[in-house]
């Protein structure tokens, strides 16, 4: 389990820790009043946050007395805060040379080395600090944190345990030890440490957050949600807690709340690839490819060499209907990771969407060379062969897919459809029933079975299959219209008329939604291109076709807002929120 990395970063917290350490600070006697005055001037400047003035003063003190450890140390701290790490290391080494038995001097040097990424050298200095001050729990804590950065978790755990021996009442130590246990999937020990941290300090927010994340990893979603909500009450700006809350809500199949949690996380930490990725995947599953594309594009700005990120973006582009751009992203994913059969398979799917069946067949066969036992690949190859009118080869591939995975319902379904289209109705019905047996909620399989049975003149059974398809998917227009035809043949004219009306209404509604979605997506592209009036026109077209389409109202509000029509924009934002409460208007500028 990934925990909040900042909890373990020695570079972020060592100064605060060392300020509490009961280890002697450099106390070399200041040689004269000029040095003393410069040194005190620097301390005063630091206390008010004026780093340039502090640096000038400490540089003066060091120039006057190069062997004064206090001045060298303070100059090193200023340089470190200014990001001049190499120069800070020089100053801290000078302090160590002047006072080699001073633990805090080694700790400051370790901090600078760790900031530079020189973890081996940093750990060496932290170990010296521990040897010089073995009774100081903060020294063990700092060493443990540095060791965890090198993934030396067992050694880090040992140091945290020693820190707890010295200071059992410190909640943060139990929390950090619990986090290390969680990284090793030792969840029972982790939970015990988090609970102890909360016993010691019931308002210690990190322990609630870490306990929630640990419980989430164990599948205890209800308890995890309770802990994460408590953490967010204490710290509403904890982006990682919002992220884990989204994970928990997804596990509970509450996609609305999950989306809200991810939106908070992205807003608070807009440059974290993991959060953006999870956000994009949920958007894609919810049928919002436009926002998914934006999320995955953001991921690629953060991790341009991540093959999975290119693959995710390509899948979202496919869902948006942009197969041409998707092809390029799949090809880049394959370039970065050429042995991934899944990327190869997805590229074949993109060729299918472009109706380039020959390229799709070639791509699926290339993927099968990498993974010849992958049933879904044989299924996709069969589909491409069928679309190329090579039915015998397609049927053979579907049979291979079924042999490799007897539970692959899609293969039975596709084979059944192909046999039906070939005129072998009994064999088709057998395959469709097999698909339904494996996946009883397969609405399309019930619908197709009903259609096949209708053609076999088994009308009562056909009606039953079609009614089941409608029960599973009430908006399945084709099932309503086919059932209407079956009922008409059975003499149920009233039932047939009702189903016919329902089917027609659904077709009309679906067509309107498609038109509204197309117009809204067109408006978004025009808005991105700077054509404000064109975008507004397209959003209004979408609303005219489908007045209850919330996203069109929201996008129209955004466009009107950009044009300076604040009142009208506000009305559109309110309408969008009424239709979909998750479409929250942006806060007014200046707030």
Residue ranges of each PLM-predicted region?
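Bacterial N-terminal signal peptides
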Residues: 11-20
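TPR-adjacent "capping" and linker segments in tetratricopeptide-repeat scaffold/adaptor proteins
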Residues: 25-37, 504-518
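Helix-start (N-cap) detector for alpha-helical repeat units in TPR-like alpha-solenoids
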Residues: 35, 69-70, 103-104, 137-138, ...
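Structural signature of tandem alpha-helical TPR/SEL1-like repeats
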Residues: 47-60, 81-94, 104, 115-128, ...
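Structural marker of alpha-solenoid helical repeat scaffolds
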Residues: 64, 98, 132, 166, ...
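Alpha-helical adaptor scaffolds
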Residues: 77, 417-420, 511-528
């Amino acid at each position: 389990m990934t925990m909040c990395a900042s909890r373990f970063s020695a570079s972020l917290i060592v100064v605060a820790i060392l300020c509490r350490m009961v280890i002697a600070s450099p106390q070399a006697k200041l040689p004269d009043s000029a040095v003393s005055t410069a040194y005190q001037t620097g301390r005063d400047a630091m206390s008010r946050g004026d780093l340039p003035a502090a640096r000038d003063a400490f540089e003066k003190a060091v120039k006057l007395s190069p062997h004064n450890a206090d001045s060298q140390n303070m100059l090193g701290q200023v340089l470190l805060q200014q990001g001049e790490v190499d120069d800070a290391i020089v100053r801290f080494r000078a302090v160590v040379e002047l006072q080699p038995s001073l633990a805090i001097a080694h700790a400051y040097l370790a901090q600078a080395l760790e900031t530079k990424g020189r973890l081996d050298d940093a750990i060496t200095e932290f170990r010296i600090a521990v040897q010089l001050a073995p009774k100081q729990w903060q020294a063990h804590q700092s060493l443990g944190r540095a060791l965890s950065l090198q993934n030396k978790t067992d050694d880090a755990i040992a140091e945290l345990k020693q820190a707890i021996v010295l200071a059992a009442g410190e909640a943060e130590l139990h929390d950090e030890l619990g986090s290390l246990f969680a990284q090793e999937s030792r969840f029972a020990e982790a939970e015990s440490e988090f609970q102890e941290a909360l016993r010691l300090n019931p308002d210690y927010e990190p322990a609630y957050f870490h306990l929630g994340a640990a419980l989430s990893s164990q599948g205890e979603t209800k308890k995890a949600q309770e802990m994460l909500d408590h953490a967010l009450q204490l710290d509403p700006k904890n982006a990682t807690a919002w992220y884990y809350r989204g994970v928990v809500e997804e596990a509970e199949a509450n996609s609305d709340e999950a989306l809200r949690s991810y939106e908070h996380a992205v807003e608070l930490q807009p440059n974290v690839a993991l959060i953006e990725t999870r956000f994009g995947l949920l958007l894609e599953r919810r049928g919002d490819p436009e926002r998914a594309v934006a999320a995955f594009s953001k991921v690629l700005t953060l991790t341009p060499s991540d093959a999975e990120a290119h693959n995710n973006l390509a899948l979202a582009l496919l869902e948006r209907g942009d197969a041409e751009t998707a092809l390029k992203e799949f090809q880049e994913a394959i370039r970065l990771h050429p042995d991934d059969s899944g990327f190869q398979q997805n590229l074949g799917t993109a060729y299918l969407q472009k109706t380039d069946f020959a390229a799709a067949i070639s791509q699926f066969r290339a993927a099968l060379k990498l993974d010849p036992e992958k049933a879904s690949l044989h299924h996709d190859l069969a589909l491409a062969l069928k679309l190329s009118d090579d039915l015998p080869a397609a049927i053979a591939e579907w049979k291979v897919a079924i042999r490799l995975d007897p539970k692959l319902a899609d293969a039975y379904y596709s084979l059944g459809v192909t046999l039906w289209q070939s005129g072998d109705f009994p064999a088709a019905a057998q395959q469709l029933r097999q698909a339904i047996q494996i996946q009883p909620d397969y609405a399309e399989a019930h619908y197709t079975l009903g259609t096949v049975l209708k053609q076999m003149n088994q009308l009562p059974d056909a009606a039953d299959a079609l009614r089941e398809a409608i029960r599973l998917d009430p908006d399945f227009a084709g099932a309503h219209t086919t059932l209407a035809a079956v009922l008409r043949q059975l003499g149920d004219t009233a039932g047939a008329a009702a189903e016919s009306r329902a089917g027609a209404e659904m077709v009309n509604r679906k067509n309107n939604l498609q038109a509204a979605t197309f117009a809204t997506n067109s408006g978004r592209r025009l808005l991105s291109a700077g054509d404000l009036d064109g975008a507004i026109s397209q959003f209004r077209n979408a609303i005219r076709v489908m007045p209850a389409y919330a996203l069109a109202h929201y996008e129209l509000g955004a466009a009107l807002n950009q044009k300076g029509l604040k009142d009208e924009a506000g009305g559109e934002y309110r309408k969008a929120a009424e239709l979909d409460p998750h479409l929250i208007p942006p806060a007014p500028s200046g707030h």
